[in-house]
Amino acid sequence: MIYHCEDHTCNYWDEGEKLPERCPQCGRKLLRANEADMTGDDWTALGNTLWDAEASDKKRMVDCFRKAAYLGSAWGVCNLGICMEQGNGVEADPVQAFWLYQQAVEMGSLNAVCCLGVCYEHGIGTAPDAKQAAELYRKAAEYGSPRGQMLLAHAFHDGIGVEADAAEAVHWVRAAAYQRYGEGMYWLGVCYEYGDGVEQNWEHAVHWFREAAESGVSAAMADLGYCYEKGCGVEQSWEQAFSWYRRGAECGNLRSMHNLGWCYEKGCGVEQSWEQAFSWYRRGAECGNLQSMHNLGYCYEKGYGVEQSWEQAFSWYRRGAECGNPVSMSNLGLCYKRGYGVEQNWQEAIKWYEQGAQCGDLQSMHNLARCYERGEGVEQNEDRALYWYRRSAEGGNGGAMYNLGRCYKMGHGVEQNWQEAVKWYEQGAQCGNLQSMNNLAYCYEYGEGVEQNEERALYWYRRGAEAGSDYCMYCLGWNYSNGEGVEQNMTEAIRWYTAAAEGGNADAMHDLGWLYDHGEGVEQDMKKAICWYERAAEQNCPAAMNSLGECYAMGRGVPRDLETAMEWYRRAAELGEAMADYNMGWHLEQAGKLSEAYAHYRKAADGNDDSAWWALGRFYENGVVVAQDGKEARRCYETGEKLGSVKCKMRLARCKLLGIGGRRAKKAGLDLCRQALELAKESSEKEDYGYEAEMNLLRRTIAENES
């Protein structure tokens, strides 16, 4: 049964087994049609309804257009040509489509004029002829066809069959827009957005985007949402942005689907929901949106809104990469590099990094540079590494800026240049790269490549700390603890050490443990001290291992256990902790294992441990294990004194008084001994480092030589 709306201006036609009560377009009454009385345009209107219905019989649609054409409907002939061109309901036949368009043009169809012009422009069913296409577009445009006006605007914009003229293009876009043609209103908004053929004006852009969006143009909905998101030509409003993105997404606009997912991901204009974000990313990805494919892969990678799956992440990164998304290429390369969701394959990783880099993706450039620097999946090549670090850095990648600065610092692939290193650290830091902030602060602190400036160092340590760098948190805590570049403040020191420690910084864990151990800036708490020492030791922090050894050796916070202490010392010493070697030497000396003690003292001294030089000096002074040698003893004490050892200072003063290893200077020696003794008293009041025995020795020496 065929039926139509009683309102002929509505022109709704359809067919079915039953007659519905109301027209779905205007709500008026539907009337049963008599096929014998139907005109060609009636059959075309029925065919159009079947065209728009997803589940309709497309062959029946073509039959309707054939009947329309037979009855002399130019509209029907043109639509039959479109079916032939697209292969919709019939096998595609471009030549037949071209002929049908010609017939429809002769019958007066303006749409057919446009279709024929498109055939000439793209060579559909005929040889390409841009000039002929432009003439047909102009004919349709001048007769008032909004589609023709847009096609002519496109020709003037891109110089197709006519000389390019942006202003003339806008003239015809405006003509279509003033006819309330959706595409015309949208593109007029785009022209105002970019200042293309017209002076840039965001307010006008918003006006035409709104007009087009309200007429149902989904692309305009996406652009209007963007204007609200950024506050361009309209007061910024995430709620309005979200609303328009939703409308665009529900109308099938892929960009809107992605942006809607992003709103749900970030909680912008709507309550945050990873599940909703994932849902819209999936819809966009399945419809072919590259950004949605990438974000869907990211959701699977992190398990956001869906169960974590590297296999699914890899699959979507691959789809995005193969469709040309450079960011997906970078992530796909990472999957191959790490073996995430796929068997590890360095060659594939390099391949995708190179493709992403060639497409302009900054992270791909950065990753490729790292591979060249390390020789991962490709022959090591510092020149190529530097090239890609520079390309990425100059494009704005903060990580590449840091690594380029590091290359200049180390002289990798380029002559060492601290000034260039600082320049790139500065740029990386300004871009928010934490490692750049770390290194820039270090350069200011120690005057490397830039004039030393504690204030600037502290500024960047603070910036890095507030941005989440555990290393900067640690350095900031250290500055507050030691009053370096800032007034000493143990409360602030504890705060930043704690933040750094909880962020995983092993040095901060150790120093925080040390403060709890010695009750500095905080109430002494050996339980917390041991806890932080152990956490740092688990991360192979040698200083923490040594401190644990000291706690076990002295029974401080744990039961005294010399065997466990020596094990911790051994582990710390193997990692290069000189103080641990000294501590091992001390305990071995007390146990009478003098040769072993000497070996550890020597190793500790080579690591610049000041107490080890004191111990070595004693061995040489007294001829323990080694031949007695006053000069060597004196040299050891001098070295230790320069490193800050108070015990070495006392021994050196005694050597000068007694003439050990050099000329005796009684008066000057006595003065030095008294000065050293006073310094030792002050130091011993702060911390007992075994000063008492040395102080007693010095007192006896002074007493014996004063008479």
Predicted regions located by residue number:
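Hydrophobic face of amphipathic alpha-helices that form TPR/SEL1-like repeat modules
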Residues: 43-53, 77-86, 113-122, 151-158, ...
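Short cysteine-rich clusters marking metal-coordination/redox-active sites
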Residues: 5-7, 23-26
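Alpha-helical segment of the N-proximal tetratricopeptide repeat
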Residues: 38-67, 71, 82
